[in-house]
From Swiss-Prot:
GO cellular component terms given for this protein: chloroplast; ribonucleoprotein complex; ribosome
Coarse class of the protein's main subcellular location: plastid
Keyword Plastid: yes
Identification of the protein by name: Large ribosomal subunit protein bL36c
Gene Ontology molecular-function annotations: structural constituent of ribosome
Gene Ontology terms: biological process: translation
Domain of life: Eukaryota
UniProt KW keywords: Chloroplast, Plastid, Ribonucleoprotein, Ribosomal protein
PROSITE patterns on file: RIBOSOMAL_L36 (PS00828)
Annotated compartments: Plastid, Chloroplast
Gene: rpl36
UniProt similarity note: Belongs to the bacterial ribosomal protein bL36 family.
PANTHER family to which the protein is assigned, alphabetical: 50S RIBOSOMAL PROTEIN L36, CHLOROPLASTIC (PTHR42888), LARGE RIBOSOMAL SUBUNIT PROTEIN BL36C (PTHR42888:SF1)
Length: 37
């Protein structure tokens, strides 16, 4: 899980999701997991 100032899609399988006021990226590739904060 990477914590970034701006979470964005890396590949076309990445999905931007908002959970508990945080923006998350989930993907089939575990390296692409990110959180904004």
């Amino acid at each position: 899980m990477k914590i970034r100032a701006s979470a964005r899609k890396i590949c076309e399988k990445c999905r931007l999701i908002r959970r508990r006021g945080r923006i998350l990226v989930i993907c089939s590739n575990p390296r692409h997991k990110q959180r904004q904060g």
